[in-house]
Amino acid sequence: MTKYIFVTGGVVSSIGKGIVAASLGRLLKNRGLKVTIQKFDPYINIDPGTMSPYQHGEVYVTDDGAETDLDLGHYERFIDINLNKYSNVTTGKIYSEVLRKERKGEYLGATVQVIPHITDALKEKIKRAASTTDSDVIITEVGGTVGDIESLPFLEALRQMKADVGSENVMYIHTTLLPYLKAAGEMKTKPTQHSVKELRGLGIQPNMLVIRTEEPVEQGIKNKLAQFCDVNSEAVIESRNVEHLYQIPLNLQAQSMDQIVCDHLKLNAPQADMTEWSAMVDKVMNLRKTTKIALVGKYVELPDAYLSVVEALKHSGYANDTAIDLKWVNANDVTVDNAADLLGDADGIIVPGGFGQRGTEGKIQAIRYARENDVPMLGICLGMQLTCVEFARHVLNMEGANSFELEPSTKYPIIDIMRDQIDIEDMGGTLRLGLYPCKLKPGSKAAMAYNNQEVVQRRHRHRYEFNNKFRPEFEAAGFVFSGVSPDNRLVEIVELKEKKFFVAAQYHPELQSRPNRPEELYTAFVTAAIKNSN
């Protein structure tokens, strides 16, 4: 029988529910249990694919092409699993599916209501996520805060699950903030008490509290919360601020969180062996070197827009015993005249993805600086496309060369729209999304990065591609197409072989990086940057 764990939040948003859920998932996985995890987002968008990065942060793409919340990146990195489209559910997605069924007459003339139709659809998503992965345990995080009007149908569905599958198969974990008033010198439990009261008013009694705090919590405070919130005192778990996120699973294990969960759900599983994880954390805490990487992007005011890129760089740093000192460079600020001033102290330059015209000329100048000064450079998605544009302009002398996306009237459309995208008008969910194969050119830097594999599978999110009619001119000038689709139709990786490391990929390698298993192309880039710093 599948076990269901529901993680809710109270008092404030962005309290770290996703990290708590991911950490618990890692502990349960290391007990030998098969775990999956999903995120419920109460916003009305179908998915975050068309949302501004300033609003939402990065869009995380799964193997099967779902555009999802960035928390799924945390889930995959912590638990080391590949999630699917059932792992992210929004209000918009649920309502659109219910309305589509109503239009088809599938409700046989019934009045369609929040209860039971919306709540039933939500419960079906929970069960489908568990069944498609054949999991022993599914953890479901509900975005937002208890008391938000948007989350009411989600919480009602969670309440009903207890009756549907039995109380011994369901556990409710509530995460809250425990504020510390410096002037009074004490922690205040009242916000948590009121949050739990709100949750209980919706019919959900939490079985565990996870309290986010900046200071150590005395047992007396835990006992008080246990008494007023009707949970066992040992089930009041402290989640204190840490230097590195990957410390959190170990901190939760030290408080027997996973054992309490297993006892409640009657899961007979051995103790979690966290030896490898602990060794990784110890290494992360004691890195001996530092390497400066300049990240040239258009959304640098919100680092979450590049969350997976940053994490992938860190992972590759761990493998090289080096901390990554990130220098955030706004692409809008980079010009041919100041590129050396902005980028001259960087050991490596990364140009990640993005959409739209703004910042593209600055990215092109950053790529040009890297090429002309032989600074290790990694381009991702749009960064790969602009790498091709830069080469066309400044090496092949194709004045005005550009991407068709950015300048439809360009004489040299180096990057063109994919053939199967021409007649598509909708923006959402219509890109080339998900896992696709990439055939590597033997002897190339890309092939060497991937240990001379013939083919690698990586996740994509794009609508435009390199225009193949320009391939002969590029190749004649020494531009190497080191990764292509198996049918040789789509360019996946480009590079300049004579440079220390000048490689750009159409796909998003960062989405498959793990703290204990860094993505190979990122590792090759960071390794080259380290050598460049010596």
UniProtKB/Swiss-Prot annotation:
Cite the binding residues for L-glutamine. Answer: 54, 354, 382-385, 405, 463
Catalytic reactions on record = UTP + L-glutamine + ATP + H2O = CTP + L-glutamate + ADP + phosphate + 2 H(+); L-glutamine + H2O = L-glutamate + NH4(+); UTP + NH4(+) + ATP = CTP + ADP + phosphate + 2 H(+)
Q: Which UniProt keywords apply?
A: ATP-binding, Glutamine amidotransferase, Ligase, Magnesium, Metal-binding, Nucleotide-binding, Pyrimidine biosynthesis
* One GO MF term attached to the UniProt entry: glutaminase activity
Annotated InterPro entries: Class_I_gatase-like, CTP_synthase, CTP_synthase_N, GATASE, GATase1_CTP_Synthase, P-loop_NTPase
Enzyme Commission (EC) number: 6.3.4.2
What this protein is reported to do is described as: Catalyzes the ATP-dependent amination of UTP to CTP with either L-glutamine or ammonia as the source of nitrogen. Regulates intracellular CTP levels through interactions with the four ribonucleotide triphosphates.
The UniProt record gives the binding positions of ATP as 14-19, 71, 240-242
Q: Which organism is it from?
A: Streptococcus pyogenes serotype M28 (strain MGAS6180)
Q: Which positions in this protein are listed as binding Mg(2+)?
A: 71, 141
Catalytic positions?
381, 508, 510
Q: What is the lineage of its organism?
A: Bacteria, Bacillati, Bacillota, Bacilli, Lactobacillales
Per UniProt, CTP binds at: 13, 148-150, 188-193, 224
Name of the protein in question: CTP synthase
Task: Please summarize the record's notes on activators and inhibitors of this protein.
Answer: Allosterically activated by GTP, when glutamine is the substrate; GTP has no effect on the reaction when ammonia is the substrate. The allosteric effector GTP functions by stabilizing the protein conformation that binds the tetrahedral intermediate(s) formed during glutamine hydrolysis. Inhibited by the product CTP, via allosteric rather than competitive inhibition.
Anything further noted? CTPSs have evolved a hybrid strategy for distinguishing between UTP and CTP. The overlapping regions of the product feedback inhibitory and substrate sites recognize a common feature in both compounds, the triphosphate moiety. To differentiate isosteric substrate and product pyrimidine rings, an additional pocket far from the expected kinase/ligase catalytic site, specifically recognizes the cytosine and ribose portions of the product inhibitor.
How is the quaternary structure described?
Homotetramer.
**What is one GO cellular-component annotation here?**
cytosol
Where is UTP annotated to bind?
13, 188-193, 224
Q: Which protein family is named in the record?
A: Belongs to the CTP synthase family.
Listed under GO biological process in this entry are: 'de novo' CTP biosynthetic process; pyrimidine nucleobase biosynthetic process
Span list, region Amidoligase domain: 1-267
What the entry lists under HAMAP family is as follows: PyrG
| Annotated ranges, domain Glutamine amidotransferase type-1 | 292-534
- Pathway the protein takes part in: Pyrimidine metabolism; CTP biosynthesis via de novo pathway; CTP from UDP: step 2/2
